[in-house]
From Swiss-Prot:
Keywords: Ribonucleoprotein, Ribosomal protein, RNA-binding, rRNA-binding. InterPro entries: Ribosomal_uL14 (IPR000218), Ribosomal_uL14_arc (IPR019971), Ribosomal_uL14_CS (IPR019972), Ribosomal_uL14_sf (IPR036853). Gene3D superfamilies: Ribosomal protein L14. The gene is rpl14. One of its GO terms (biological process) is translation. PROSITE patterns: RIBOSOMAL_L14. Transmembrane segments: none annotated. This is Large ribosomal subunit protein uL14. It holds the Pfam family Ribosomal_L14. NCBIfam families: PRK08571.1, uL14_arch. Binds to 23S rRNA. Forms part of two intersubunit bridges in the 70S ribosome. Belongs to the universal ribosomal protein uL14 family. One of its GO terms (cellular component) is cytosolic large ribosomal subunit.
Length: 132
């Protein structure tokens, strides 16, 4: 895992629903925790593009539903600024399910993957068809 190049806005707090962008059988995920989050009193933990979160599978195949799994956020609706001054936002909030080490469990990723997530997680960048 590598450090993030730009300052990502943490716009997905606990309880946020994400689209599962891989072929593991999960369709919708809910964020239940953010790994390595250090916050303040009464503030919800939140993650953004490139962060590892723990999710509960809300919709999907019967084998996948109700499981708690680690995932990496690859797209977010809230725009964030890159170091070169450009602003990036996507049309949905999406994540891919991974192992605790960061290698994806699925064999393909649907849709674009943010450059920040691809740089930080080499396993995700190997499966990404579009890096934006």
């Amino acid at each position: 895992m590598k450090g993030l190049g730009s300052n990502i806005v943490r716009s997905l707090p606990n309880g946020a629903r994400l689209v599962c962008a891989d072929n593991t059988g999960a369709k919708e995920l809910e964020v239940i925790a953010v790994k390595n989050y250090v916050g303040t009193v009464r503030r919800l933990p939140a993650g953004g593009v490139g962060h590892m979160v723990f999710v509960s599978v809300k919709k999907g195949t019967p084998e996948m539903r109700k499981q708690v799994l680690p995932a990496i956020i690859i797209r977010q609706k809230k725009e964030y600024r890159r170091a070169d001054g450009t602003r990036v936002k996507f049309e949905d909030n999406a994540a891919v399910i991974v192992t605790p080490e960061g290698t994806p469990k699925g064999s393909e990723i649907k849709g674009p993957v943010s450059k920040e997530a691809a740089e930080r997680w080499p396993g995700v960048s190997r499966l990404a068809k579009i890096i934006h």
